[in-house]
Amino acid sequence: MIYNYPRFPGGKTKAVTLSYDDGTVHDIRFAEILNAYGLKCTFNLVGYRVANEECLTHAFIRENILGKGHEIANHGYFHRAMDTLRPIEAIRDTLDSRLTLEKTFGIIVRGMAFPDRTVNRHQKPELYKAVKSYLEDLDIAYTRCSGGIENDTFMLPEDFHNWEVTAHHNNPRLMEYADKFLEIDVDAQYRSRRMPRVFFMYGHSFEFDRDQNWDYLEAVCQKLAGREEIWYATNMEIYNYIHAYQSLVYSADGLLVYNPTLYEIWFDVDGILYHIKPGETITLRDEVHF
């Protein structure tokens, strides 16, 4: 075995995911559009707004967000920038928000987008290290970064607590990035570059209302939707699937593979596509296809 790469469910080589913040009333129209096109989004909600049903009702979130396969994630209880807080304040803000979301909707919430400003490992490495440590203690599985960092390579993150987006929807190059993403033939890449790709757009739904460009959102959805090679997933669905892939157990020679997870997992080994069911052990072919 020379190269082993994950493939998304069904053997797909690409995924599209969205991440939108704050839980404002504009999420109602936003969710309607996404649902019409079959795109999936992670809605990052502010705890105190949820507790007080300030913008969205609990019924709407249950029926039109969670009920349509989207994710809700943590965006702080008071939407406070974590780089301005003492650790104890940031921990409480994060935990209070998580507890509110979980108790209100009866689900486990392990995803997060940094509120107000990103804590990025490249820009603020020491602060990021400290923040990541207590987020892990709080069982936050991933955190989305934003704010000037673009990932137009579409690669999966090496560190899910520093998950960099492709672009904000207002980025003037967004459609260019979308075309670039769609044109990539992953399996035709050089063998050391056949990693799966993810197109990751973020923003705030109120920006479409403010800028009067809901038609632009529809144009983006039309471009990305309905493609056989793409898995439309939430942030947490991608995290969980990749975590399951990373949990596969191999024999010393790499030819026996055991799946201890509850996921059916697809992966490419030296040009051959495999899938393995939960609890299954399979034998890989001892050959290489370039």
Q: Where is each model-derived feature located?
A:
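Structural preference for beta-strand elements that scaffold enzyme active sites
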Residues: 15-17, 40-42, 69-73, 109-111, ...
